[in-house]
């Protein structure tokens, strides 16, 4: 039996789509030196090559892919989006605006200088900034801009071509810039990280190990009574000295949870909770032959929960003001916008931040009720909320504004982005509403993006040879300029206008470019995870601004003729 593969793929859109995805994902795993191609560029390259062979896909799949992707971007940004406009977030907002605004301005000027159309210009901007949201925003706006069908098809093809030609240029140049730019300025990044660590009491170790607390029991003997010298637990300050917390006392056979006024007595059995190294710091009066095994005393349910910050008495306060240890709880991690941040007593908590806390189940529940709620341990997605807000986003995208003879619509990209932000924000405030497991969100977002990339590549592949020969050299040079010049402008603005700490500034710059590989290089250079504070500050707002930049450059382009 003979099987014509070309006819088989052309006759089955679903089969063609998944063949493109599988081959593209395999290609994306390849590395050029230390740089991995990535899933997006892998799928795009394969789809362009197959598009040259006149394979095509149903455009409905393309539209659904970008809609799912941009909606999930909004959901991820929602919990921390509005907090960016307050306190230190103003600096991050300005940095993101400078980065995105300067890139859009430079791309527009270069597009006019080289005589490109809006498709090539917007595609070059998206590729140089390694930003799929720019590509999505521009493509959606073009489709709703009322262009003649032949001009629309050409613009969309050029959009894909510009993105494909400049993506690797943007990624590699930013990674190289992240490696060498810190060495070109007079402040050492490691010194800057240590400086802010001293000012804020940070842990500069970028590879800090996290242990679960352990429970051990000790019997109070003459040495321990003498060491306590009649002081109560508050006066002894055992936690301040060692990091261990007295959770229970057995006295005369009765178990009790002590308060700060309790005084240790001869024959007491006490249960201490703390990290392994904290037990090692205990006074020898505790440890020298005094450890006991008491099943009931040690029978505590130590749990680790993720607490979402929500309540007004926690939002806007410093981490140290929560006094978690006073409640017998231990902080393991602080996560903001899916980014792990340093354990910093002076970090100002935002609504939607996630604190990973360990301790006795009852105490952790009490702390969670004070500052927010415990994140749902469920793998079930609230599909009703997902679908309802998706519908709202599509309806918002139908809104059209009329100015004299000129009209433009909000478009699906902006509408779905706004609806996603609202769903993410409401999820951060209501524990049982709109829950989407992070793994499920990542899968839908990544799948939507890959479907979108496959669609644009297949549609643009037929004309890539002609386009490459006409603008290839110009496009690569322009991509390099748009990739690096806004970073330099952003650095000068942050360093000399905002006067930011350099470690925080470089992290914020990489967040404004939404580039995780470059962020890892900055952290390695600083030998600290402190730059993650800046990265988290700009990342959420930058994703939104980049989507709007793709929409805006298409809207203003006709007025620049």
Swiss-Prot record:
This is Putative transport protein KPK_3686. Residues 202-288, 292-373 form the RCK C-terminal domain. One of its GO terms (cellular component) is plasma membrane. It is found in: Cell membrane. Belongs to the AAE transporter (TC 2.A.81) family. YbjL subfamily. It comes from Klebsiella pneumoniae (strain 342). It holds the Pfam family TrkA_C. GO terms for biological process: potassium ion transport. InterPro entries: AAE_transporter (IPR050144), RCK_C (IPR006037), RCK_C_sf (IPR036721), Transp_YbjL_put (IPR023017), YidE_YbjL (IPR006512). The lineage of its organism: Bacteria, Pseudomonadati, Pseudomonadota, Gammaproteobacteria, Enterobacterales. Keywords: Cell membrane, Membrane, Repeat, Transmembrane, Transmembrane helix, Transport. SUPFAM superfamilies: TrkA C-terminal domain-like (SSF116726). Its main location: membrane. The chain crosses the membrane at residues 8-28, 37-57, 66-86, 94-114, 158-178, 383-403, 406-426, 447-467, 478-498, 540-560. PANTHER family: K(+)_H(+) ANTIPORTER SUBUNIT KHTT (PTHR30445), TRANSPORT PROTEIN YBJL-RELATED (PTHR30445:SF10). It is a multi-pass membrane protein. One of its GO terms (molecular function) is monoatomic cation transmembrane transporter activity. PROSITE patterns: RCK_C (PS51202).
């Amino acid at each position: 039996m003979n099987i014509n593969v070309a006819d088989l793929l052309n006759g089955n859109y679903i089969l063609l789509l998944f063949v493109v995805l599988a081959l593209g994902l395999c290609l994306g795993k390849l590395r050029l030196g230390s740089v991995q191609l990535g899933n997006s560029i892998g799928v795009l390259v394969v789809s362009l090559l197959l598009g040259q062979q006149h394979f095509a896909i149903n455009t409905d799949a393309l539209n659904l892919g970008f809609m799912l992707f941009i909606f999930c971007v909004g959901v991820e940004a929602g919990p921390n989006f509005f907090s960016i406009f307050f306190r230190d977030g103003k600096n991050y907002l300005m940095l993101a605006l400078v980065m995105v605004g300067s890139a859009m301005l430079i791309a527009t000027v270069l597009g006019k200088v080289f005589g490109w159309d809006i498709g090539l210009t917007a595609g070059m901007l998206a590729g140089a900034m390694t930003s799929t949201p720019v590509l999505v925003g521009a493509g959606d706006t073009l489709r709703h801009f009322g262009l003649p069908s032949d001009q629309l098809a050409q613009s969309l093809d050029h959009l894909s071509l510009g993105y494909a030609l400049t993506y690797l240029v943007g990624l590699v140049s930013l990674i190289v810039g992240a490696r060498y730019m810190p060495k070109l300025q007079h402040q050492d990044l490691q010194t800057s990280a240590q400086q802010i660590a001293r000012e804020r009491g940070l842990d500069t170790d970028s590879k800090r190990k996290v242990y679960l607390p352990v429970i051990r029991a000790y019997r109070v003997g003459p040495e321990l009574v003498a060491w306590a010298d009649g002081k109560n637990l508050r006066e002894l300050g055992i936690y301040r000295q060692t990091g261990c917390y007295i959770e229970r006392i057995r006295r005369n056979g009765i178990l009790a949870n002590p308060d700060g006024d309790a005084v240790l007595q001869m024959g007491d059995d006490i249960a201490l909770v703390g990290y392994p190294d904290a037990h090692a710091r205990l006074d020898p009066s505790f440890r020298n032959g005094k450890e006991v095994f008491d099943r009931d005393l040690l029978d505590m349910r130590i749990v680790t929960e993720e607490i979402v910050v929500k309540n007004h008495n926690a939002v806007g306060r410093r981490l140290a003001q929560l006094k978690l240890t006073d409640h017998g709880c231990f902080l393991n991690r602080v996560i903001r916008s899916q980014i792990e941040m340093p354990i910093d007593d002076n970090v100002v908590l935002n609504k939607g931040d996630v604190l990973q806390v360990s301790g006795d189940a009852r105490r952790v529940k009490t702390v969670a009720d004070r500052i927010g709620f415990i994140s749902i341990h469920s793998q079930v997605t609230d599909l009703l909320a997902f679908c309802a807000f998706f519908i709202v986003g599509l309806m918002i995208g139908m809104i059209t504004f009329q100015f004299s003879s000129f009209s433009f619509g909000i478009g699906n990209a902006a509408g779905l982005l706004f609806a996603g932000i609202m769903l993410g924000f409401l999820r951060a405030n209501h524990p049982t509403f709109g829950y989407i497991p992070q793994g499920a969100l990542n899968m839908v977002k990544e799948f939507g993006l890959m479907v979108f990339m496959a669609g644009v590549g297949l549609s643009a592949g037929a004309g890539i040879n002609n386009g490459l020969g006409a603008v290839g050299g110009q496009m690569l040079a322009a991509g390099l300029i748009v990739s690096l010049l806004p970073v330099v402008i952003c650095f000068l603005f942050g360093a000399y206008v905002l006067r930011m700490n350099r470690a925080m500034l470089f992290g914020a710059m990489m967040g404004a470019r939404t580039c995780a590989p470059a962020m890892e290089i900055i952290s390695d250079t600083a030998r600290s995870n402190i730059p993650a504070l800046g990265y988290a500050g700009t990342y959420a707002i930058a994703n939104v601004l980049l989507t709007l930049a793709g929409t805006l450059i298409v809207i203003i382009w006709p007025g620049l003729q």
